[in-house]
């Protein structure tokens, strides 16, 4: 028999549905994501830590799950909210159904609710604190949990999701025809800061000839410089960049030493903070794989993958920083470059996973930048 589940928002709204994962209680910031595919990649993306993810596409789970699609070694999202989960997945790569995968990973999830109504609430009122409860239901307890959640603003989540020890990475993207990872001869020594890095980012860098050393978020700049890197990569990650003063301090050192820098997502915001800009909390953020972004230099419009709840305040950028990309949804900043130092960053996810690869050329730009410096 199907277990019951509820979703309670901080504004008092209660949604009733069916449990499609583990039983229990989970709290977080409720957000909506407009991607049609890639649910497994989304749930294992560390950038979704402490978030209850609503997927707006109605049928989620059609293709099942496979270990090869994980973006980290665990599920980082706080929970999953969907309209419908098909009973039988159909895909030649599928190893397990989404429901069984969620239960095995201990993820609380709800299906059978009006996700269109929920999305409209989040769009109009902004991201809400919420609580998911499955199994034994206690609405009052769930309401208390939703109200007691402190929220993501002010939380330093980068050091929570980051690796505790440094490691090397060599594998490129998976070649499905051969069932093996592509490899390229290493040409550039790159240190990648793990603020919540996705595996596909490391794969795309390795595939372009980067000899990668991944280091914890709080690694001091002098330890990185001792490795004599050709470039430093600032990864994606969850939460508010404001508490990450250790990261800003390290980035300032790299800028001063003119080490080539490429940042994405949280790394983009940290680079902006390092040059003196402010980062502000957005109403409901950008979460999806269909976000149009314009390259202001060429005028070209690209469809991008996005996942962030904070944005760089362009008005606070100094004169030596040029805005390179802007969202066509709301005009928020999507990219910057320093005019006097080899450093640039992008707010979205050029590695996609899930999503389009319109902006994966940014990885090539990083390679070109390192080649010019060397």
From Swiss-Prot:
Annotated region (CPSase), positions in chain: 1-186
Single GO MF descriptor: ATP binding
Catalysed reaction, written as an equation: hydrogencarbonate + L-glutamine + 2 ATP + H2O = carbamoyl phosphate + L-glutamate + 2 ADP + phosphate + 2 H(+)
UniProt xrefs under CDD domains: GATase1_CPSase (cd01744)
Active site: 265, 349, 351
GO BP: any one term: L-arginine biosynthetic process
PROSITE patterns assigned to the protein according to its UniProt record, in alphabetical order: GATASE_TYPE_1
EC number from the UniProt entry: 6.3.5.5
Pathway annotation from the record: Amino-acid biosynthesis; L-arginine biosynthesis; carbamoyl phosphate from bicarbonate: step 1/1; Pyrimidine metabolism; UMP biosynthesis via de novo pathway; (S)-dihydroorotate from bicarbonate: step 1/3
Every Glutamine amidotransferase type-1 domain range: 189-374
Primary enzyme class: ligase
Positions annotated to bind L-glutamine: 47, 237, 239, 266, 269, 307, 309-310
A family per Pfam: GATase
Entry keyword set: Amino-acid biosynthesis, Arginine biosynthesis, ATP-binding, Glutamine amidotransferase, Ligase, Nucleotide-binding, Pyrimidine biosynthesis
Gene3D superfamilies (UniProt xref): 3.40.50.880, Carbamoyl-phosphate synthase small subunit, N-terminal domain
Assembly with partners or alone: Composed of two chains; the small (or glutamine) chain promotes the hydrolysis of glutamine to ammonia, which is used by the large (or ammonia) chain to synthesize carbamoyl phosphate. Tetramer of heterodimers (alpha,beta)4.
Family: Belongs to the CarA family.
Role of this protein: Small subunit of the glutamine-dependent carbamoyl phosphate synthetase (CPSase). CPSase catalyzes the formation of carbamoyl phosphate from the ammonia moiety of glutamine, carbonate, and phosphate donated by ATP, constituting the first step of 2 biosynthetic pathways, one leading to arginine and/or urea and the other to pyrimidine nucleotides. The small subunit (glutamine amidotransferase) binds and cleaves glutamine to supply the large subunit with the substrate ammonia.
Official protein name in the record: Carbamoyl phosphate synthase small chain
């Amino acid at each position: 028999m199907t277990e019951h589940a509820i979703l309670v928002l901080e504004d008092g709204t209660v949604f009733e549905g069916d449990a499609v994962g583990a039983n229990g209680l989970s709290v977080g910031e409720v957000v909506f994501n407009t991607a049609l595919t890639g649910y497994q990649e989304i749930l294992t993306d560390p950038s979704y830590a402490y978030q209850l993810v609503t997927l707006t596409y109605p049928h989620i789970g059609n293709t099942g799950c496979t270990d090869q699609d994980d973006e980290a070694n665990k599920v980082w999202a706080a929970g999953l909210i969907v309209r419908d989960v098909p009973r039988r997945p159909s895909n030649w790569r599928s190893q397990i159904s989404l429901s069984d995968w969620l239960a095995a990973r201990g993820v609380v999830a709800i299906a059978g609710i009006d996700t269109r109504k929920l999305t409209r609430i989040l769009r109009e009122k902004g991201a809400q604190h919420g609580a998911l409860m499955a199994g034994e239901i206690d609405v009052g307890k769930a309401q208390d949990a939703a109200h007691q959640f402190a929220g993501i603003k002010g939380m330093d989540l980068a050091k929570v999701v980051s690796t505790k020890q440094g490691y090397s990475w060599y594998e490129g993207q998976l070649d499905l025809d051969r069932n093996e990872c592509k490899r390229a001869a290493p040409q550039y020594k790159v240190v990648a800061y793990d603020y919540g890095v996705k595996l596909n980012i490391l794969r795309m860098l390795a595939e372009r000839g980067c000899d990668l050393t991944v280091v914890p978020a709080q690694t001091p700049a002098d330890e990185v410089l001792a490795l004599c890197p050709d470039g430093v990569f600032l990864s994606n990650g969850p939460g508010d960049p404001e508490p990450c003063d250790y990261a800003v301090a390290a980035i300032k050192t790299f800028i001063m030493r003119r080490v080539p820098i490429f940042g994405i997502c949280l790394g983009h915001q940290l680079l902006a903070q390092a040059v003196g800009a402010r980062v502000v909390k957005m109403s409901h953020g950008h979460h999806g794989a269909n976000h149009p972004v314009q390259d202001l230099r060429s005028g070209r419009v690209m469809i991008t993958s996005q996942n962030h709840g904070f944005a760089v305040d362009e008005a606070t950028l100094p004169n030596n920083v040029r805005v390179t990309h802007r969202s066509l949804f709301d005009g928020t900043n999507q990219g910057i470059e320093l005019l006097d130092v080899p450093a640039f960053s992008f707010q979205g996810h050029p590695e996609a996973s899930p999503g389009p690869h319109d902006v994966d050329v940014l990885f090539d730009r990083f390679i070109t930048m390192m080649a010019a410096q060397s």
